[in-house]
Amino acid sequence: MGNHNINAEEIALYDRQIRLWGFNAQQALKQSRVLLITASPLANEIAKNLVLSGIGKLCVLDSMTVYEKDVEEQFFIEASDIGQLRANVFKKKLHELNPLVEIDTDTSLISEIDEGKISKFSMVIATQLDYEEFCRINELTRICNASFYATSCFGLYGFAFCDLINHNFAIDRVVDNTKVEEDMFIVQKPMKEAFQSILGETLKPRLAKKIPTLYPAMLSLLKSKKSDPDSIRQVCIEQKLNEKTVLNGEFLSKFSSNISFQWTPVMSVVGGVVSQDALNSISKKQFPIDNFWIFDAESGLAPIYRL
């Protein structure tokens, strides 16, 4: 462990946010060690915000090289970077944003992530993986007692899942015209258990009606990488959800065409929400995502569901 005391240079750089959330919160950020899995366009947004906030260390894990498509989708990447490792390009650009944050890279494959790698970090943020990969990494973060975020964007849609295990935090309340800090505590489920908990046979009718069509649609994408109506219906069958209640024909007809691209505004919103929530959880400020957040840019809705 390095020196986690905030020095004069850092106080000057982070002065505005120290005034906003306090010295202790900034100290907690400096002590944090975050593993960001994949150098995706979404990870681009998240990494930028984390590094500018002054976390202690960020490690970008990605084994891919830069292609022309990356140049089109990521503001970190330029045409001259084609052929280089994405993780190395990320490291260079992130260091330019904030030289005070330690930036590291890992070019391992996703399948090579093990307990030894995860144990070095206090938080893991995984982006653009499939369902099984998300769940496997979440199992490792629980073994290592590390906070976990899973997040992806699909065209006009995005989601974030949060597993902070057992999380203590504080929120500000106004009591008798006086601001007081109230201690809070939540217990969260691992991703696999949380997603299996939405079974139609165990839901009350009132709750079943609140399940958005976007839920089985996204789960179909995560599990099978398929977005056609039949695949989405299959998810409803597996989760014992009432198709007539959950599925919306008009939505299904548009969903497939709305996920075939990466749209920067959506990634900015999702990346901003995930990074801010991660910063809040590190500093133990504000109520975190508990535990599944969906963003629908088409409707402008962004509900949170407690699975």
Curated annotation (Swiss-Prot):
GO terms for molecular function: ATP hydrolysis activity; SUMO activating enzyme activity. The keyword Magnesium does not apply. One of its GO terms (biological process) is mitotic chromosome condensation. This is DNA damage tolerance protein rad31. The keyword Transmembrane does not apply. SUPFAM superfamilies: Activating enzymes of the ubiquitin-like proteins (SSF69572). GO terms for cellular component: cytoplasm; cytosol; nucleus; SUMO activating enzyme complex. Could be involved in a ubiquitin-related process important for DNA damage tolerance. Acts in a process which is defective in the checkpoint rad mutants and which involves hus5. Keywords: DNA damage.
